[in-house]
Amino acid sequence: MSFDTSTYNEALADAASILACRLPSAERPFFYLHLGAEYDLAGFFDAPPAEIPLHELSPSLPRARTLDGEETRLLAGRIEGVPVLASAGARRVADGHGALAALFPTALASIMGVKNHIFLDTAISLVSEFKAGRWGMLADYVSDFAFSPLEGLHGMLDKPFPDLAHTIDQSQNSEILNAKADFGEPPRLCIYHGIPGFHLPTSAEAARSRAIGADFLGHDLVLHVILSHALGCHVSALVLAGVQLLPGFPRSFTRDEMRETGLFCSGQLRQGLRRAILEVRRASEGYAENILPESDADEVLCRNIKLSATRSSPLKAFLRREPPTQEPT
């Protein structure tokens, strides 16, 4: 079986009911993380998460493994005490099962009320600033897909014509940037260019992406970002430079090389992401450190050095006194 837009809503509703019964906690997840096959997930969660193969939530979902040889599955657990739902082994449109199947986890998290989304992907760096292993954070993106992930899904949207000018949530981005700065070099803002397929690009494709201002060249990330924002979610996206493809330096590389970079950088990602999730949760709850009220410095000093009227200062003997003035006779 496969999806069409007329049955997509019903399939999502059924999957949400099944998933709600299988979550380890009755508390609704606060975060949704979308992870590719490149990252080592050991230690991401406070304890081993519950794992649910995605195809068990709907008969219309494919059972076949992804092009990376992964089984797409949902992980449910806690990170720094915050309930999180994650999708691991992301399926891509190029797998051949359609965009609706690839986007199913993102849409499912949205309709379940999980409104804070972070997407992670490994892509090809096109500029010298992003060396292999360097993280970027999406400030904007360009999509070359011939279709929109919203086609036929307008019944799910609050607005049939969503404004994509502010897709990325800058407030959430700030919390993530600050958190990751404590664990190495913070990610830099970047422009992501998404193209169809799942291939390693030609030099001409890379040059065209640079010409439109892109820092990274990748694939399906843009589709998830658009759908998530259109469904009313707070969206952030981190992209890792798996390899670097610079002008004038043509080179050959493999998908395995990109995956190795992702595995190598998983530790830094894990530390920064755990802190970021906690900080975003605190910010959403209006958490703030206790800040002392402003005081006048003179009043503070006076209050702290004032002597009791019943006690004398041990320095009293050293006080200078002016001699008494004598009135003229």
Model feature map: region roles:
Residues L245-D298:
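His/Asp/Glu-rich mid-to-C-terminal helical/loop segments that flank catalytic regions of hydrolases
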Residues A283-P328:
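A short, charged, Gly/Pro-tolerant segment at domain boundaries
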Residues M1-L164:
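Metabolite-binding pocket within alpha/beta catalytic cores that recognizes anionic/polar moieties
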Residues D220-M258:
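Zn-dependent metallopeptidase/amidohydrolase metal-coordination segment
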Residues N173-S174, N178-D215, V280-E285, E289-P293, ...:
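Active-site/ligand-binding-proximal alpha/beta "capping" segment
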Residues Y141-V142, A146, E151-F198:
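Histidine/lysine/aspartate-rich catalytic loop segments that bind and position anionic ligands
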Residues K115-N116, D215, H234:
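Short acidic/polar active-site loop segments enriched in Thr and Asp
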Residues L108, R208, V225-L227:
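Hydrophobic/aromatic ligand-binding patch that stacks against planar heteroaromatic rings
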